[in-house]
C-alpha cells in the first residue's frame, strides 16, 4: 500500500515537472503587416501567458494611433514573419477597445504553433480590414 502511494506521488511529481508557464510578447506596427500599411503613429503590444499543461492562454493587448476604431483583433497562425494565416483566437469582442484582456484554451496543435513562433497578433480597422498593425509573438 505504501509502495503504491509512493509510486503515485512520484508520478505526480514527474507530470508537474513537465508543466511550464511560457510568456510571449509582440510589438505591433503597420510596417509588419503583409503588405505594409500606411498608418503613421499606429502601434500596439500584445502579451500572453501559456500554461503548457492545461493549454490555457491568458492575453492582453493594447493599441493607439489607429486610423479609426479597431473593428477586430486576433491571433493568427501558423505563419512565419512576412506570411499571412487564418484566425486562431479572437482578441476581445467585435469592435474591441484598447486595452483588452481575455483567455482561451488551445489545442495541442495550437500550442505547438505558438511555441514555435508561428503566431502573430493583428488589429483590424475599417480603413485596413485585412489588418492595420501586426506583430509576431515571441517567447520571453
Predicted regions and their residues:
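Metal-centered catalytic cores of metalloenzymes
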Residues: 18-73, 77-140
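Gram-negative bacterial Sec-dependent N-terminal signal peptides
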Residues: 1-18
Amino acid at each position: 500500500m505504501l509502495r503504491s502511494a509512493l509510486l503515485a506521488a512520484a508520478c505526480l511529481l514527474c507530470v508537474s515537472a513537465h508543466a511550464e508557464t511560457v510568456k510571449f510578447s509582440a510589438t505591433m506596427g503597420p510596417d509588419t503587416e503583409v503588405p505594409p500599411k500606411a498608418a503613421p503613429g499606429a502601434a500596439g503590444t500584445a502579451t500572453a501567458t501559456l500554461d503548457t499543461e492545461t493549454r490555457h492562454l491568458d492575453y492582453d493587448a493594447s493599441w493607439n494611433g489607429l486610423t479609426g476604431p479597431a473593428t477586430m483583433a486576433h491571433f493568427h497562425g501558423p505563419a512565419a514573419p512576412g506570411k499571412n494565416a487564418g484566425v486562431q483566437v479572437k482578441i476581445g469582442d467585435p469592435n474591441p477597445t484598447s486595452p483588452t484582456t481575455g483567455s482561451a484554451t488551445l489545442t495541442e496543435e495550437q500550442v505547438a504553433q505558438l511555441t514555435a513562433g508561428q503566431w502573430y497578433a493583428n488589429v483590424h480597422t475599417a480603413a485596413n480590414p485585412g489588418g492595420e498593425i501586426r506583430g509576431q509573438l515571441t517567447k520571453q
